[in-house]
């Protein structure tokens, strides 16, 4: 299968795109992110797999959001002997068109065209291989599964050197075996289809036999229950008659007891009324006697209360006099304490003022010392600021002076020395210098540079040194200039002056540091402004009239101690008098309270006595004392007679055993009620069983049981026949599975060898992989280090996934080949391996079609023979 052309119109965000692909080689389709590269693969799948009227989510989601139009996909494909142009429009005005160009021209539309394409692809394309030969963004690192690719299996059979001739129908045979197996079992091995129906039929037949047998047993049980219920009804009728006679006898005895009980209840009511009357008259007589006793008692209590009140009044007067004396003594002690406290406060204030004066003197001396040191430090800092020479400038001057000395020595060592000896008195001119020589006197000059010597009016001699000397002269001049610049920057005349100035600077720095340290020690943790503020506060707090000459700190402290001692003594005396006064006041309050309480009590007793005497006079006016006593005695005799009547009736009632009679009546009634309910229930159950038996007689349950047993025999026979076929299909499938596994073991080695051939240029000569029977890569070995596939980096997984697909593409026969689609892979790969992967692409591209979609075309720059398509240029 080869893809020659793909055109998209109104597909997602793509308005129109038409891309043509070469028949073989590597095609790199590049474009920016979200330009629609992955949409091209998606569009090809929609074209081949879905009808134009499909309403599935995959089709709906590609409709453009900015226009109400249909999405259109056109592809030109060759597969086996066929070459065709296939077009579909989805969503709006749905259309399907097919033009077959080879082997003979055909034109079809609609579902007929769709089915024709699927038929051609089913004949010529290994669908599993077509889907496996893709590296998509969403699963670029997943291990590829090539086990279901028949085209690759045939190729690996040939590569493995299988002696058996391939007929091309192996896959069809396996499919037929799988189809036969699927008639009886699900993929997980559970019964399904005909086998499941046979199992279900047998189970249903056995359940029907069980149900019918249960129904027949139910009829037998109904006959047995009818007999038992008939006997039970007769027995319950006899028991009910006997218990009804027992109930009647119990009722007669209960009625007799009820009559006695009524008489006893009436007697109790009479006795209760007599008791109430007797109680009232007795209570009235007792109340009269109690009132007389109360009057006598209250008279004595009034006399005693008045005596106690008089005594409490005397005690109150005594306590008041004592309290007044204690209060006067407390007032005197308080005045003495106040005077002593004033003296103590004055002495303490005098001592604090003396301490503040001493602290002010110390602070003044300290601040004077600080001011002197700050003045010295400011003078040192001023002298330091006047020194422009720094340590760096000194180092620069020393380096420049050393360079001048070295340059002068080198220049002197290579320069010519010219000596003049005057025969007569003569004057020489050397530059701006005039030299006078007397006869016989000598003078020499070193020619470090071009030098002119003139004898005025006689000659001019020019001495020119060599090139080396000129170079040294230039360096010497530069060194001198550097020295002059450094001296000027340091404002010194020469090196000695610079060193002297540096020594002076160091001494000034040391002096400044000493003064700073001394100043820090004097200030401590406080700032100078704080010290000055404290001094001002101390000075401002001193009174103008304080005589500090006549008083010293020791005298003031002694006076304060004496006054404090007097204050403490006065406080103790005051506290003692306060406690005494408080005790006297407390006693006065207690006696006053007691006197008041006793006076109130005497008044209350007198009032109660008057009230009692008034109440007695009122009662005597109504009933006299003798009449009240006679009535209480008569009511008591009536009560005794009524109580005796109650006792007699209670004895008579006890003799009849009312509890036993009531229990017998209740037991007999319960027994009759229970037997009546059981009798009625038995009659009802007997009727229901009779009705059920009459219904069972019309249902033919025995016949149904015979029919169910016959159906079970037929179902068991059918179950056995289908079971034999199902087991045979399962056995054949397991044999073919073992054969397929054995065959796949032969596939592994040629596939693994092809992987090694393609992978060693990328990973190196030590590259090896382990492949399972499903042709999945399980591990990779480099330099004798084996790493499971799941533990590899994302880049290594991508590279192995691409190599696995390229190996499959290299192995399949030319007529079975499908395009290898790679969607934006190798993003995790370093540049060196990218170049090596490019060589592998070139190798595979020579025989097959490899389509690479990428947003970074530089990744595939190593693919020398690639055909490149820029989507940005064809938008």
UniProtKB/Swiss-Prot annotation:
Q: Which SUPFAM superfamilies match?
A: P-loop containing nucleoside triphosphate hydrolases
Recorded hits in Pfam families, A to Z, give:
AAA_15
Report the GO terms under cellular component.
Answer: peptidoglycan-based cell wall; plasma membrane
PANTHER family with a match to the protein in the record: DOUBLE-STRAND BREAK REPAIR RAD50 ATPASE, PUTATIVE-RELATED (PTHR41259:SF1)
Q: What is this protein called?
A: Uncharacterized protein Rv1278
Provenance organism: Mycobacterium tuberculosis (strain ATCC 25618 / H37Rv)
């Amino acid at each position: 299968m080869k893809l020659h052309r793909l055109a998209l119109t109104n597909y997602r965000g793509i308005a129109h795109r038409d891309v043509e692909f070469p028949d073989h080689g590597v095609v790199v389709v590049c474009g920016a992110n979200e330009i629609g590269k992955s949409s091209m693969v998606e569009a090809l799948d929609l074209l081949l797999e879905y009808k134009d009227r499909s309403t599935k989510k995959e089709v709906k989601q590609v409709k453009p959001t900015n226009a109400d139009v249909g999405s259109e996909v056109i592809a030109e494909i060759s597969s086996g002997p066929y070459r065709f142009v296939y077009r579909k429009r989805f969503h709006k005005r749905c259309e399907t068109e097919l033009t077959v160009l080879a082997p003979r021209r055909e034109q079809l539309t609609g579902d007929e065209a769709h089915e024709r394409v699927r038929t051609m692809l089913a004949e010529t394309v290994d669908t599993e291989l077509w889907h496996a030969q893709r590296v998509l963004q969403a699963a670029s690192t997943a291990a590829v599964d090539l086990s279901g690719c028949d085209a690759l299996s045939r190729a690996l059979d040939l590569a493995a050197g299988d002696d058996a001739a391939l007929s091309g129908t192996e896959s069809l045979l396996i499919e037929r075996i799988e189809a036969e197996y699927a008639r009886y079992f699900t993929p997980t091995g559970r019964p399904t289809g005909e086998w499941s129906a046979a199992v279900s039929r047998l189970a249903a037949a056995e359940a029907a036999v069980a149900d019918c047998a249960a129904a027949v047993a139910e009829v037998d049980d109904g006959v047995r229950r009818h007999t038992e219920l008939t006997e039970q009804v007769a027995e319950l009728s006899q028991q009910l008659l006997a218990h009804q006679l027992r109930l009647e006898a119990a009722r007669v005895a209960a009625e007799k007891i009820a009559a006695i009980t009524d008489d006893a209840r009436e007697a109790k009511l009479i006795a209760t009324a007599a008791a109430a009357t007797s109680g009232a008259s007795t209570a009235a007589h007792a109340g009269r006697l109690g009132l007389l006793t109360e009057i006598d008692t209250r008279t004595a209590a009034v006399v005693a209360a008045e005596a106690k009140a008089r005594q409490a009044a005397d005690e109150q007067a005594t306590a008041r006099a004592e309290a007044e004396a204690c209060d006067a003594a407390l007032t005197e002690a308080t005045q003495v304490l106040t005077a002593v406290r004033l003296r103590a406060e004055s002495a303490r204030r005098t001592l604090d003022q003396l301490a503040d004066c001493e602290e002010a003197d110390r602070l003044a001396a300290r601040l004077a010392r600080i001011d002197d040191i700050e003045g010295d430090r400011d003078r040192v800092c001023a002298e330091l600021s006047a020194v422009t020479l720094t340590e760096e400038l000194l180092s620069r001057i020393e380096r420049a002076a050393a360079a001048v000395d070295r340059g002068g020595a080198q220049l002197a060592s290579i320069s010519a020395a010219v000596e003049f000896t005057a025969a007569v008195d003569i004057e020489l001119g050397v530059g701006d210098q005039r030299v006078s020589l007397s006869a016989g006197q000598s003078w020499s000059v070193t020619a470090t540079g071009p030098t002119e010597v003139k004898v005025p009016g006689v000659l001019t001699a020019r001495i020119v040194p060599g090139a080396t000397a000129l170079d040294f002269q230039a360096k010497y001049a530069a060194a001198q200039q550097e020295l002059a610049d450094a001296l000027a920057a340091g404002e010194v005349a020469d090196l000695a002056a610079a060193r002297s100035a540096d020594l002076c600077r160091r001494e000034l720095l040391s002096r400044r540091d000493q003064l700073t340290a001394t100043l820090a020690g004097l200030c401590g943790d406080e700032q100078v402004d704080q010290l000055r503020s404290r001094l001002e506060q101390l000075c401002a707090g001193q009174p103008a009239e304080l005589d500090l000459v006549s008083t010293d700190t020791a005298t003031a402290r002694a006076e304060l101690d004496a006054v404090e001692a007097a204050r403490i003594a006065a406080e103790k005396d005051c506290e003692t008098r306060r406690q005494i006064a408080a005790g006297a006041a407390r006693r006065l309050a207690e006696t006053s309270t007691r006197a008041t309480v006793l006076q109130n009590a005497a008044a209350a007793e007198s009032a109660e006595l008057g009230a009692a005497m008034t109440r007695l006079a009122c009662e005597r006016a109504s009933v006299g004392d003798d009449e009240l006593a006679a009535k209480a005695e008569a009511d008591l005799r009536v009560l005794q007679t009524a109580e005796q009547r109650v006792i007699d009736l209670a004895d008579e009632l006890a003799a009849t055993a009312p509890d036993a009679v009531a229990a017998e009546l209740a037991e007999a009634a319960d027994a009759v009620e229970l037997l009546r309910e059981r009798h009625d229930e038995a009659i009802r159950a007997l009727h229901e069983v009779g009705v059920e038996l009459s219904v069972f007689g019309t249902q033919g349950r025995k016949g149904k049981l015979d029919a169910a047993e016959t159906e079970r025999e037929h179902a068991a026979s059918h179950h056995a026949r289908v079971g034999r076929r199902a087991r045979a299909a399962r056995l054949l499938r397991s044999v073919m599975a073992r054969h397929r596994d054995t065959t796949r073991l032969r596939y592994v080695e040629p596939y693994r060898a092809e992987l090694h051939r393609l992978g060693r240029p990328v990973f190196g000569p030590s590259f090896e992989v382990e492949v399972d029977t499903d042709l999945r890569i399980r591990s990779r070995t480099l330099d004798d280090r084996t790493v499971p596939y799941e533990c590899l980096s994302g880049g290594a997984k991508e590279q192995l996934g691409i190599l696995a697909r390229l190996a499959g593409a290299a192995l399949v026969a030319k007529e079975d080949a499908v395009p290898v689609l790679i969607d934006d892979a190798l993003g995790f790969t370093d540049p060196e391996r990218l170049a090596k992967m490019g060589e592998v692409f070139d190798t595979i591209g020579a025989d097959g079609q490899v389509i690479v979609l990428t947003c970074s075309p530089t990744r595939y720059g190593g693919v020398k023979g690639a055909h490149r398509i820029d989507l940005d240029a064809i938008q």
